[in-house]
Amino acid sequence: MAAISYDPPATLKAFADARGITFPLLSDPGSATIKAYRLLNEQATGKTAGIPHPGTFMLDARGVVTSRAFEASYQERATAGSLIGSTVKGETGSTETGQLTLKTTTSDLVVAPGARFAVFVDVAPKSRMHVYSPDQTTYIPVALEITPNEAIKVHAPRFPPSEEYLFKPLNERQRVYSRPFRIVNEVTVALTPAVRERARAADAMLTVNGSLRYQACDDKVCYQPVTVPLTWNVRLEPLAR
């Protein structure tokens, strides 16, 4: 990981030292590299003149760009962890029902106002069990719902591709998950004055609540729908200014 900015090396070093940043911060005098990649924000003036459009490039081990992600504004930015789909070491929860085991994790341990990070639900159906995917409209599909609150903006959840399953008792072909799968839901920390003030407090925390609703079936029986409450916790830090 590395970041590039038009700031001089001394400014970048002071910023990195103050924030505990260990990855390289690259100085781009005169925004030469930014201009070469056609990333210069030509509408930026005054103190912001020379800045690039906010974005992230993903490279493979050979240094080849494999994907990129750009933002509409500088204030709300996806975290590196959410872009690469990483899971932090701190597991925030584990739940088991009669049909599934669930683990809840996050892309980041620490977030700031404006950060767009991801919460994950890893779902493992038990032996012979399956749940219906969102594209199976004739039954109750698996659904993740994040509880809205004033500190976050909730984005749409993302589900992996499902598999086709033949339910022999009814001779029906259905779209299901019968193997472990992950649901990803991004949330953006609000930039409101209240949340910024809250982030300045020592040991400030942000709690995201939600629920997973599903109906599971085995090869013979469909069980009652279940709603499982879920919680994710991350530490909240103030913006660097």
PLM-predicted stretches and their roles:
Residues D7, G30-S31, R62, N149, ...:
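Solvent-exposed coil/turn segments that connect beta secondary-structure elements
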Residues G20-P24, L39-F57:
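Structural micro-motif
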Residues T48-T104:
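Thiol-/selenol-based redox modules, centered on thioredoxin-like
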